[in-house]
């Protein structure tokens, strides 16, 4: 168990529920998600996603936001099944049961930031093209970015950038 409370982000499966920050005192708090939880490490972001180990067996709803974030942050995971049920995001400490804080900048991006735009690039070295849609949340932008990569073969790379709110 950790010696101090750490900041985590809950990503609810139900899209209408907002992401929220939580304070966890240790691994037992993660186990409140389910009787048996499994980690999904996202090394590029130094975080771990925890979810119900029996997510599909229990017919839990797909977690589009967590699945999109994993696919955007870890391109190798794009061929893996979607994540289901609520997902708890914690800082990765390199240990199986020790947990750390989600990086502060990432908490801001996920919970407090926005709006965001998605940019695409056809080939390395080519100019980036800003797509016309503005997304209120980072998770919405990540979903759109992954769709661009999967459904538009001319797109070789995508990135998400925080942008200014459109003038009213």
Predicted segment positions?
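Short intrinsically disordered terminal tails
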Residues: 1, 165-168
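A short, charged, amphipathic alpha-helix used as a generic interaction element across diverse proteins
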Residues: 30-37, 134-159
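Surface-exposed beta-loop interaction hotspot
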Residues: 95-115
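Short aromatic-glycine-(Arg/Gly/Cys) micro-motifs in beta-strand/loop hairpins
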Residues: 108-129
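Short, extreme N-terminal segment that most often corresponds to the first beta-strand
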Residues: 1-19, 24
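Amphipathic alpha-helical packing elements
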Residues: 18-45
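Short, structured protein-protein interaction patches enriched in aromatics and acidic/basic residues
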Residues: 45-75
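Ordered, amphipathic secondary-structure segments that act as subunit-interaction surfaces
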Residues: 76-102
